[in-house]
């Protein structure tokens, strides 16, 4: 009916306005944040400064990098939720793709705080996936970062890929404290949970999986730790 169509148009306009507003705020914040990061790096590396001052500058840089990641996650999850993020899918061999993404992470400073292993079954090595490579990289980065940031170093991280029941399965597990019960309840709830903990990075993981026609399952590792399993459709 005309009334229902008009209602849907209003909802679409509201969602678009929200996405545009978040994108605008994210853009405006990035410029001063880039300056803060740049100055902090300069001060951190300035040999003329006393060690305590350089250490504080390093702290400012680290916290600024966290803030930048949060802004990126907020912008991305908003676009994914409201269909404003175009997927640039390409056909990839899963084995080389996962190795490439893991190698990229190993080049980051956070990788020094973990013991990372990768295991891929022969079927997973040969599997074909139709994915947006940067988004899948973001998904894996968020999972690994979450394990490292919420556990004492060095945390042991294992990535395993396999083909199960006609789907590609990627599991990321750690030996840390595990997801708090409130976080698991919020992540696995079918509807948004009231007063849910702030888990933006993990929501991005969930949204990226859904955008690819897959799903992310968050749970507990054995005997302890966090475990997330990503299920993606195979491209045949």
Where are these regions (language model features)?
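Short helix-loop "hinge" at the ATP-lid/N-box region of the Bergerat-fold HATPase_c
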Residues: 146-148
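Short conserved segments within the C-terminal catalytic ATPase subdomain
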Residues: 83, 108-120
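Short alpha-helical segment of the dimerization/phosphotransfer core of two-component systems
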Residues: 62-67
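Conserved micro-motifs of the catalytic ATP-binding
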Residues: 82-87, 128-131
